[in-house]
Amino acid sequence: MSGLEQPAELSRVWRWLLLVSVAICAASGLVYELALVSLSASLNGGGIVETSLIVAGYVAALGVGAILVKPFLRWPAQTFLAVETLLGLIGGLSALVLYMTFAVVGQNLWMLVLATALIGILVGAELPLLMTMIQRGRLADARTTGSLVATLNAADYLGALLGGLAWPFILLPWLGMMRGAAAAGMINLLAALFVGCVLLRHLLPRAQFIRAVVALLVAIAVLGTVLVRSDGIVATARQQLYRDPVIYAHQSDYQDIVVTQRGADRRLYLNGGLQYSTRDEHRYTESLVYPGLSDSARTALIIGGGDGLAARELLRFPDMRITQVELDPEVIEVANTILLPDNGGAMQDPRVTVITDDAFTWLRAGGDGGQRYDAIFVDLPDPNNDTMARLYSQEFYTLALARLNDGGRMVVQSSSAYTTPDVFWRIASTMSAAGCGAVIPYHVHVPTFGDWGFQLCGPEGTELGLRGDTPSLRFLTDEVLAAAGVFGADNQPRELEPSTLDHPRVVEDLRRGYRQAGE
């Protein structure tokens, strides 16, 4: 007996252990890619462009890896252990390295592409190496090779399924992106160590075997350090993203939530995007809320706005009743704790009913018994990805308008009227297409945001103005509101095609605006 050849009874055990190892490695490989998708969504918005690059790049890299490994098939055992060591280390560190790169140099699509390509190439090299070991080990002959290839592919695909389930249900919620990827890398490396020590130990020269084991142990130690110390590493990197000290940071099931504070200036960020600053949030909040209230308004629906600031203003009217629909329960938790001084405990007021659900799904399902409201306020982050674009679509506004009482009004935050004018006017056109009787665009200056825009939707004849019993405000007056409806000659109203579920035009509008602003 020589080379990879095994006794018959050992061959069966060898084969099944190898198939289990294949499944584990496949699971780890998919977890690395899902970690990149999740990180892209958290840092860059993770729209169709990034996701397509990751998926297509990964699949293409699999083929490249299968080609590049050909010269090394003469040494399948040695090469397999080297590939798994690199894969576990690169995949396990990928999320952390990309996060740190983003913190230092900002958005870098090339780093995402590079990480995807490296992982894909290494994963693509696995099956040719495994098949070579199986064939040389005489675990299959001409009659059974096809069956074994099918079994090998089945193990690979089932392993990918396990990885696809483990990431959203176990690794991400329990460990987060950085530690989750590192944990997958450790599992990958431990599987490779098992294969090396149990299945391939007698097939390698002693010196090569020792070097392979030492390399695997060093890689495991590196990822173990990341698992233990990742919170501190991430905290240091995260601070580079924000000008003020971070006092709270948490990755929820939906987004990265960060609160910073310097002196009296407290700021909320979701996925790196500023939601408000206590220096000037009153300008934004008053401009969002008060134009949407008719004199008879007594019921209001807030979509988004989980910070509680819009609810705070509405509760200044004693007979107001509010339904708040917020996707992320952890934003509500932050609003009820760290942000409590800013919203005055609005989310805990008995006049406010808080619902944690996707607003589109909730409206479509007739949530709250299909109740209609006198005012609706859509206070959501900008539509920087296709998921968020659903809530800026013609279909969404149609659902929302169906929940307005006769004579009711709806206000939608509409991004920067100056930096992203196409987004601003696209939202106006989309609301008109959804059936708004009158759409009145307006904009105000919010120092931390710049020139910020809103759309007021109401019945024909609706005008910008404050209701008669409006309490004393810090910023908004009838005169300010009248001026808010005036636009310069370089930014006049324009008719654009609506943004829809089928064609979320508003996402590209936003990206184009940011690109042009950065030129």
Curated annotation (Swiss-Prot):
Boundaries of each PABS domain copy? 225-459
InterPro entries given in the database record:
MFS_trans_sf, PABS, PABS_CS, SAM-dependent_MTases_sf, Spermi_synthase
Enzyme Commission designation = 2.5.1.16
Q: What is the lineage of its organism?
A: Bacteria, Bacillati, Actinomycetota, Actinomycetes, Mycobacteriales
User: Region (Spermidine synthase) spans which residues?
Assistant: 200-463
Q: Where in the cell is it found?
A: Cell membrane
Name of the protein: Polyamine aminopropyltransferase
Which pathway does the protein contribute to? Amine and polyamine biosynthesis; spermidine biosynthesis; spermidine from putrescine: step 1/1
Give the gene name: speE
Please state what class of enzyme this protein is: transferase
What's the short name of a Pfam family annotated to this entry? Spermine_synth
The reaction(s) annotated as catalysed by this protein in its Swiss-Prot or TrEMBL entry are: S-adenosyl 3-(methylsulfanyl)propylamine + putrescine = S-methyl-5'-thioadenosine + spermidine + H(+)
Tell me what topology the record assigns in the membrane: Multi-pass membrane protein
Q: Which HAMAP family match?
A: Spermidine_synth
Q: How does it assemble?
A: Homodimer or homotetramer.
Write out the residues that bind spermidine.
D307
**Database matches in PROSITE patterns:** PABS_1, PABS_2
Q: What does the sequence similarity comment in the record state about its family?
A: Belongs to the spermidine/spermine synthase family.
Quick one: which residues bind S-methyl-5'-thioadenosine?
Q255, E326, D358, A359
User: Can you list the GO cellular component terms from the UniProt entry?
Assistant: plasma membrane
